[in-house]
Swiss-Prot record:
One of its GO terms (cellular component) is HslUV protease complex. It is found in: Cytoplasm. Keywords: ATP-binding, Chaperone, Cytoplasm, Nucleotide-binding, Stress response. This is ATP-dependent protease ATPase subunit HslU. ATP binds at V18, G60, V61, G62, K63, T64, E65, D250, E315, R387. Its main location: cytoplasm. A double ring-shaped homohexamer of HslV is capped on each side by a ring-shaped HslU homohexamer. The assembly of the HslU/HslV complex is dependent on binding of ATP. It holds the Pfam family AAA_2. It comes from Desulfovibrio desulfuricans (strain ATCC 27774 / DSM 6949 / MB). GO terms for molecular function: ATP binding; ATP hydrolysis activity; peptidase activity; proteasome-activating activity.
Length: 437
C-alpha cells in the first residue's frame, strides 16, 4: 500500500492533471485514510469504511484522469465502468456485480505481474538452462559440452543467436479448442463453462519451430508459472482488491432521474437499487471465491447537466458522502495543459515526429492561439473540455504527420502564424460538427 502523504499525492497528480485542486485534495485524503485504517487495532479496523466520492463536472475536465492516476500511485486495482451499461436484475444486459468480478481479474493480473517480476531472475536462469539443453545434442562429451555450453550462453546473452530457429515442445492450455462466446449479461456463466472445458481436456503438448528470442520468452513464462504459487497469488489479489480496490463509476448522472421523469424511468431506479448493496458492502461470488466490497473505494462521476445528486435514491446518496465540483476549463487551463504535464500533448507530438527525424517545436504565441481557439469552439458548440485540444492538434499537424517520412531532418516551428494558417478554413465556419469528438 502507498505510504504517500496527501501533499505528496497531490504533487504527483499535478504532473498529469491541471487545476481541480479541491478534487485532488479529496481523493488524496481518501487514499491516505486507507493507510491510516491499516494501522488501527483489528477490532476498530473493520468498523472504518471508505468515504465514497461523487465528482461533478462537464466532460474533459479531468475526472477520470484523477482517479486513474490515483490508482497507479497507490498500486491499487482500478476499473472504470459506465453506469449506463448496467441493467436491473431480470433484464438483458450486464449486472452490477460484474464490475467486482472484473476488478478481481485486474487484481489477479496486477499481483501476477508483481510475482513474475519477483521471480524474473530465477525464471530467466532456468529458461537459459533449458534453452542450452535444446541447442546442445547429448553426443558431446562432458567437458566439451560444458565448454560449448558456456560459449553458446555468452553468444545468446549478447543477442547473436536471436534469429536462429529452434524446435521445442510447447504446452497449450486445455479446452479442446472450444471458444466460449458469452451472452451479454452472462459473462460469469461463459467463464465457468470455459473453466469446465479446460479441466475436462488436459493441456496439449506440441512441437513447434520458433526463433530463439521467442522461445526464450515462452520458457520464461513457463518457469515463472512453476515458481509462483497460484493459490497464494489468488489470496494476495483477493486481499488487495478488498482492501485497496477502486471502482470508478462514470455517467452516474444518467441513471439519476429528475423529478419530472421519475415515473417513466423505473429501470434507472432499479440499477440504483442494484448498486446499493455493492456500494454499502456485500459479498460477490467470483471464480476466485467471495469478494467483500465493504472497503472498496467507489468514485462516481457525472456531468449532472439535467439532473443532480439529490435525484438519486436517498439510500444511494448516503453512500457517497463526499462531493466535489470540478470547474470547466478555459484558455489559461488549456495553455497549462499544453505545457505543464509530463505527458503534455506537445511533448507527445514532438516525440512521435522525432521518430521520423523531424524536429518539431512550439512557440508560446502558437500555444496561446491553440488555447484560445479551443476555448472559442467549446463556447460555440458542445463543451468537451481538454479533449478539444486533441482535435485541434490533429488538424494543425495533419499535413506534417502525412508527409513526415518524406522530409527527414526538417525543422518545424509551430507559431501563431502557423496555427492561424492551418485553422483559417474553420475559424469563420459556423458548422463545426466535425470538431466534436
Amino acid at each position: 500500500m502507498s505510504t504517500l502523504t496527501p501533499r505528496e499525492i497531490v504533487a504527483e497528480l499535478n504532473k498529469f492533471v491541471v487545476g481541480q485542486e479541491q478534487a485532488k485534495r479529496m481523493v488524496a485524503v481518501a487514499v491516505r485514510n486507507r493507510w491510516r485504517r491499516q494501522h488501527l487495532p483489528s477490532d476498530l479496523r473493520d468498523e472504518v469504511s471508505p468515504k465514497n466520492i461523487i465528482m461533478m463536472g462537464p466532460t474533459g475536465v479531468g475526472k477520470t484522469e484523477i482517479a486513474r492516476r490515483l490508482a497507479r500511485l497507490s498500486g491499487a486495482p482500478f476499473i472504470k465502468v459506465e453506469a449506463t451499461k448496467f441493467t436491473e436484475v431480470g433484464y438483458v444486459g450486464r449486472d452490477v456485480e460484474s464490475m467486482v468480478r472484473d476488478l478481481m481479474e485486474i487484481g489477479i493480473n496486477l499481483v501476477r505481474d508483481e510475482e513474475n517480476a519477483r521471480v524474473r531472475k530465477a525464471a530467466e536462469a532456468a529458461a537459459e538452462s533449458r534453452l542450452m539443453d535444446l541447442l546442445l545434442p547429448n553426443s558431446f562429451g562432458q567437458e566439451e559440452r560444458a565448454s560449448t555450453r558456456e560459449k553458446l550462453l555468452q553468444q545468446f546473452r549478447l543477442g547473436f543467436l536471436d534469429e536462429r530457429e529452434v524446435e521445442m515442445e510447447v504446452t497449450e492450455q486445455g479446452g479442446g479448442g472450444v471458444d466460449i462466446f458469452a451472452i451479454p449479461g452472462m459473462e460469469q456463466m461463459g467463464g465457468q463453462v470455459k473453466d469446465m472445458f479446460s479441466k475436462a481436456f488436459p493441456p496439449k503438448h506440441s512441437r513447434r519451430k520458433m526463433k530463439i528470442r521467442d522461445a526464450f520468452n515462452v520458457l520464461v513464462q513457463e518457469e515463472s508459472g512453476k515458481l509462483v504459487d497460484q493459490d497464494a497469488l489468488s489470496q494476495r489479489a483477493k486481499e488487495r482488491v478488498e482492501q485497496t480496490g477502486i471502482i470508478f463509476i462514470d455517467e452516474i448522472d444518467k441513471i439519476a432521474s429528475s423529478s419530472q421523469n421519475r415515473t417513466s424511468d423505473i429501470s434507472r431506479e432499479g440499477v440504483q437499487r442494484d448498486l446499493l448493496p455493492i456500494v454499502e458492502g456485500s459479498s460477490v461470488n467470483t471464480k476466485y471465491g467471495m469478494i467483500r466490497t465493504d472497503h472498496i473505494l467507489f468514485i462516481a462521476a457525472g456531468a449532472f447537466h439535467f439532473s443532480k445528486p439529490s435525484d438519486m435514491i436517498p439510500e444511494l446518496q448516503g453512500r457517497f458522502p463526499l462531493r466535489v465540483e470540478l470547474q470547466a476549463l478555459g484558455r489559461e487551463e488549456f495553455l497549462r495543459i499544453l505545457t505543464e504535464p509530463d505527458n503534455a500533448l506537445t511533448k507527445q507530438y514532438e516525440a512521435l515526429l522525432g521518430t521520423e527525424q523531424i524536429r518539431l517545436s512550439f512557440t508560446m504565441d502558437g500555444l496561446e492561439e491553440i488555447a484560445a481557439f479551443a476555448e472559442d469552439i467549446n463556447s460555440r458548440t458542445e463543451n468537451i473540455g481538454a479533449r478539444r485540444l486533441y482535435t485541434i492538434m490533429e488538424k494543425i499537424l495533419a499535413d506534417i504527420s502525412f508527409d513526415a517520412p518524406d522530409m527527414p531532418g526538417a525543422q518545424i516551428v509551430v507559431n501563431k502564424d502557423y496555427v492561424v494558417e492551418h485553422l483559417q478554413d474553420v475559424r469563420g465556419d459556423q458548422d463545426l460538427t466535425q470538431y466534436i469528438l
